Amino acid sequence: RNTKLYNGNISQSIWKTASDNSTRYYNYYYDDLNRIKRANYYSWSERSRFNGSFSYDKNGNLLRLYRRGAVVENPEVRNYRDYGTMDNLNYTYDGNQLTKVKDFGKKQYGFIDGADTDQEYVYDLNGNMTSDANKEISKIYYNHLNLPTKIEFETKRSVIYYTYDATGSKLKKEVARYGLPSKFTEYAGNYIYENNELQFFNHSEGYATPNNVGKFDYIYQYKDHLGNVRLSYTKNPNS
C-alpha cells in the first residue's frame, strides 16, 4: 500500500509501456535521514520482480545493495524462474573511499564482480580513482583539473585518451585498440562526431541524427523529475 509523503520524497511512480499497456509502479520507502531504503515493484503479473533494498553506514556511504532482476540472457516475461537476485552487493571503505565490492548475487548480471582482493579501488592524493580491478582498469591518468586523460586496461589491448580545452570541456575521445583502427569521438558543442562523421546533435527537446537522404531525423525525449529519459519518440514518416 502506498503512503503519501509530505516532505518532498517521492513515494510512488507509475508508468505504462506501449507494448503491453500494463500498469507498473514502484513504491519507495525511506529511513529517518530521508535515504531510500527500499523500492518495491508491482504489476499484475510481475510482483516483486524488480525489488531493491539499500543500507548505509553512519557517514551515509552505501553498505549493502540488494536488487532483483533478470538472471538469464533472454528472460521470458511470464517465466518467474528467469528473474531472481541480480545483485547482492557488500561495500567496504577506507574512510569514505570505496575499496572493495563483493557480489553474492548472479555475478554475470548487474554489477560485474571481476575481482576479489582487499584493495579493488585505488586513489591518488586528490581522491581521484586511479585503478578499478572490477573493470580491469590498471591505471587512470589525470590532468591539473582532475579530469581523466588516459585509461589503461590490464589486458593491454585497448587504451582510452581524452582531450579537453582550457576550461575542462571535453573535445575528443580516442579508443585505441590493439590490431584494430582507433575510434575517435569529437565533441563540438552540441555536435557529436565519430571518425569525422556527424552522429547527432542535441536540441532543447532531444536530439537529431542525419538520415540517408541528406536531412535529419528529430528524436524527442520525455524526461522524469531527475532528467532521466523515460520515452523517446519521432514523427510517423507516413503521416
Regions found by a protein language model. Name each.
Residues 1-166, 171-219, 238-239:
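Acidic/glycine-rich beta-solenoid
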Residues 230-238:
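Short, low-complexity export/processing leader segments characterized by acidic and small residues
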